[in-house]
């Protein structure tokens, strides 16, 4: 499975919403697709499923605003 597809699947699971796969440029925080509690779950799932540790200190909502931006950020951290 392609890395981007893995990340989008993970996002869809955490958000409980497939819109992140259908529109990877959707603003997930502005649109209320992911809230602050789900953000913590997202970071844990990234570590568990992808083996990429992301500190809450490294998390920036602007840099992680869309699924595509999240994929880019995680590719840099791989």
Swiss-Prot record:
Pfam families: PP-binding
Gene3D superfamilies linked: ACP-like
UniProt pathway annotation: Cell wall biogenesis; lipoteichoic acid biosynthesis
A GO molecular function held by the record: D-alanyl carrier activity
InterPro entries: ACP-like_sf, DltC, PP-bd_ACP
GO BP terms: cell wall organization; lipoteichoic acid biosynthetic process
Location of this chain's protein in the cell: Cytoplasm
Domain annotation Carrier: ranges: 1-78
The record's account of how the chain is modified after translation: 4'-phosphopantetheine is transferred from CoA to a specific serine of apo-DCP.
Keywords: Cell wall biogenesis/degradation, Cytoplasm, Phosphopantetheine, Phosphoprotein
GO cellular component: cytoplasm
Residues with the O-(pantetheine 4'-phosphoryl)serine modification: 36
HAMAP family hit by this protein: DltC (MF_00565)
Function: Carrier protein involved in the D-alanylation of lipoteichoic acid (LTA). The loading of thioester-linked D-alanine onto DltC is catalyzed by D-alanine--D-alanyl carrier protein ligase DltA. The DltC-carried D-alanyl group is further transferred to cell membrane phosphatidylglycerol (PG) by forming an ester bond, probably catalyzed by DltD. D-alanylation of LTA plays an important role in modulating the properties of the cell wall in Gram-positive bacteria, influencing the net charge of the cell wall.
Family affiliation: Belongs to the DltC family.
Name used for this protein in its record: D-alanyl carrier protein
């Amino acid at each position: 499975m392609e890395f981007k597809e893995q990340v989008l699947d993970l996002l869809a699971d955490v958000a409980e919403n497939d819109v992140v796969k259908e529109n990877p440029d959707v603003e997930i925080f502005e649109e209320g697709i992911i809230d602050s509690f789900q953000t913590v779950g997202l970071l844990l799932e990234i570590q568990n499923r992808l083996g990429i540790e992301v500190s809450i200190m490294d998390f920036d909502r602007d840099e992680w605003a869309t699924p595509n931006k999240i994929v880019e950020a995680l590719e840099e951290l791989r």
